[in-house]
Every structure is written in structure tokens, then in C-alpha cells.
């Protein structure tokens, strides 16, 4: 399906309309940002790697009953997706303390949490995507309690499926953030799942295989993304 006009350009992707008003083409860029856009750069072939990783993980989740916006991969950088109305929230899932949570709560990075933590952030770059709670989200009109129930149920399944899947590849799923969209009365998993949106550590060495390598100037960023793709595809 051919793409037409560009409807939206974000930090990591471009969204194009198609001849079908219900479908869009999503193009994955090599641009990399961190700290709400304060740090910017490029990671060679990141768009290709993230498109391939996301396509595979969304297909996996669909097989486990998670409804997503993903239709099919069109090329190395493009995928066909349902046109959704994005819920203006990010759902953050934390299995191990790292990043902002470790800093905020004074925890050592790598601390094994006693239970999985679910957080919400309000998608607003100007505000720095602030953390909010469920009642905030409903009070400001971002969602409803009924919709949140569906979002949390899907999120729990995503975490359960991905934790087990990554474990089989020798990868520890530290945390991740996901987004959802509305489509014909349903709530679908949208956006992407990749080393841009997940913290992924090698189970044996705790080597970071995700965007923290870019955030923290650790080097070998592309190599880490390639390692994730190779492991999940069995190469």
C-alpha cells in the first residue's frame, strides 16, 4: 500500500496517510533523542533495526491475544498499521529498578522489585511527560476508568509475554513504556516496542543492550540493537 502525505513526524518515526482512511504507513527514522529531546543524535540503521524488532514483537503479542495497531511490515523501515487515536498516556512497566525510578526512590540500579510497578505519564513534551496517577488521567479527560482497566489488562499480558520471551533469549526485561490507541471502539497497543522503549540487559553480565547506551554515552549503540535483533530471531 502506497504512502501519501506525511501526517505527523515525531522523534523517531514519521506517519503517512494511505488511500485507505483506516490505515497509515509508519516510517522508522535513525534519529535518537534522550531526556525529553534535550540530547539528540543519530544511530546508524536504528530505524531498520527497530522496525524489524517491533514487527516481530507485535506479531508475537498478537498470537497471545494482545490486539495491536500492527498490520504488516512493508519494508526495512516501514510498516502498515491501523490509524488509531493515540491515548495521551505512556504506561511504564518496571520489573527491576533502573533509570528515573532508581534515582527518584534512592534505589540501587538493578534492585529486584518485590512486585511489578505500573506507572502513568501524561504525554506532553512541554511539561516533560509528568508522572500522574489514574485519577489524574481521568480527571483531565485523557482516558476513562473503563478504558484504563483495558489498558492495564493488556499491559500485564504484554509484560508477562515479553518477560518470558526475552528470558529464553538470555535477556532480562528491566522496564519498558508502551502506548495505546483507540480504533473502532477498541483499545489497541500502538507505537513501538524496541530497545528505544525498553531497558534490556544481558542476563549473565547485566550488559545494557538498549538506548541507555546512547543516553549515557556508553558507545556501541548500534551493536546493542543488532544483538537484540539477532537474539530474538535466533541468528
Curated annotation (Swiss-Prot):
It catalyses: 5-amino-1-(5-phospho-D-ribosyl)imidazole-4-carboxylate + L-aspartate + ATP = (2S)-2-[5-amino-1-(5-phospho-beta-D-ribosyl)imidazole-4-carboxamido]succinate + ADP + phosphate + 2 H(+). It comes from the Bacteria. Gene3D superfamilies: ATP-grasp fold, B domain, Phosphorylase Kinase, domain 1. One of its GO terms (molecular function) is ATP binding. It is an enzyme of class 6 (ligase). It holds the Pfam family SAICAR_synt. Disulfide bonds: none annotated. Pathway: Purine metabolism; IMP biosynthesis via de novo pathway; 5-amino-1-(5-phospho-D-ribosyl)imidazole-4-carboxamide from 5-amino-1-(5-phospho-D-ribosyl)imidazole-4-carboxylate: step 1/2. One of its GO terms (biological process) is cobalamin biosynthetic process. SUPFAM superfamilies: SAICAR synthase-like. Its EC number is 6.3.2.6. InterPro entries: SAICAR_synt/ADE2_N, SAICAR_synt_PurC, SAICAR_synth, SAICAR_synthetase, SAICAR_synthetase_CS. Keywords: ATP-binding, Ligase, Nucleotide-binding, Purine biosynthesis. Belongs to the SAICAR synthetase family. PANTHER family: MULTIFUNCTIONAL PROTEIN ADE2, SI:DKEY-6E2.2. This is Phosphoribosylaminoimidazole-succinocarboxamide synthase. It comes from Clostridium acetobutylicum (strain ATCC 824 / DSM 792 / JCM 1419 / IAM 19013 / LMG 5710 / NBRC 13948 / NRRL B-527 / VKM B-1787 / 2291 / W).
